[in-house]
Amino acid sequence: MEMHWITLVAFIATFFNLAATSINNSSLPDVDLTNPLRFFTNIPAGLNFNEVIFLERNGFYLGGIDSPSIYHLINGTAVYFGDVRDNIMPGTVGTTRNVTDVDYGSLLTEYGYEANTDYVSRWIATHVVISPLNATEFFQTPVPVPVPVPITILHQQVNSKLH
């Protein structure tokens, strides 16, 4: 009987170990950047960051509720570079912090708190370009567009292990 208990305990320990490993591995999905078109989606006019639009592949999403964290991919690794906190005041963009070479704060400098979330969404779409060869093609000429625009920026949830 004692052998059965040992076997059961060993099985449970193995199960939880495998589960923990799976959770850790799922926080950074394996992303193939050889074809950036895989990640193209459209931002409809009127989008704001309180609308959740899922990029179903790899668990990334664009936008989020309350305080979405913005990530981009460098060599297949998701890198956190800022929060957009539009819950501070309706129609405004709050503070952000940068942990990469992406000067996301310049968005606030250029447009300040008068920028609404719809315009900010399209600003990001026209300024942030992710490619497999050059992940630093940022800050192109601003083009406010009333129609859907292609975007390759990827976002991941705030509670990611990257935080």
UniProtKB/Swiss-Prot annotation:
Main location: membrane
Cellular localization per UniProt: Membrane
Transmembrane segments: 7-23
Name the UniProt record assigns to this protein: Uncharacterized protein YHR180W
Topology of this chain in the membrane: Single-pass membrane protein
Organism phylogeny: Eukaryota, Fungi, Dikarya, Ascomycota, Saccharomycotina
Organism listed in the record: Saccharomyces cerevisiae (strain ATCC 204508 / S288c) (Baker's yeast)
UniProt keyword terms in alphabetical order: Membrane, Transmembrane, Transmembrane helix
Top-level lineage group: Eukaryota
GO cellular component: membrane
